[in-house]
């Protein structure tokens, strides 16, 4: 989120956000202590056209992975490298004595986040991550554990080394990537004997959108990143909702 202050006006630009992530509980503190009342909220509205339902939290995904690690010796997770909160959460699901593996690029990103944020939250303390060298893969073969994978030939070769009957591949991304025409993800998911979805939305639910708007108490709400901007009015009936077109300007 960005709080923009200029010429006596205060504008809150939310970007994509959600309250069911690992840090969702601190949102009220941020709104109360750091933001307060604003004149305008420019907010994402990805979910306003969807039916309301309780969003699965990142902590619930972590619990599912713990269960999969008890059921399967080898758990492979396909998720976005930039979804670092999920990588931190799932890495912490791996029990002592088992391996947690990712490639060098993913490990570097995790370390950058840990270096900057671990002093503010223990959640971001550096987890024990290994990169897939021959000795590590031998240990993974013997003890099992969790491996973050990407759709490429390197990980395809690695996955084929392990018994598919003792393996599961968890698809932890937006399903549209998998179902789009000519996607190579279905073929990748077939490398193990079993695959399952393990994902939750990266966007705020309608109730969470309403909650943040009411907290910020703006006079004007401007929806963006939505296929149904007109539905924003039903979420905040006591606010003025302005629907802007691309390149259209609004003077406050």
Give the residues covered by each predicted segment:
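Structural recognition of alpha->loop->beta junctions
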Residues: 33-37, 119-126, 193-195
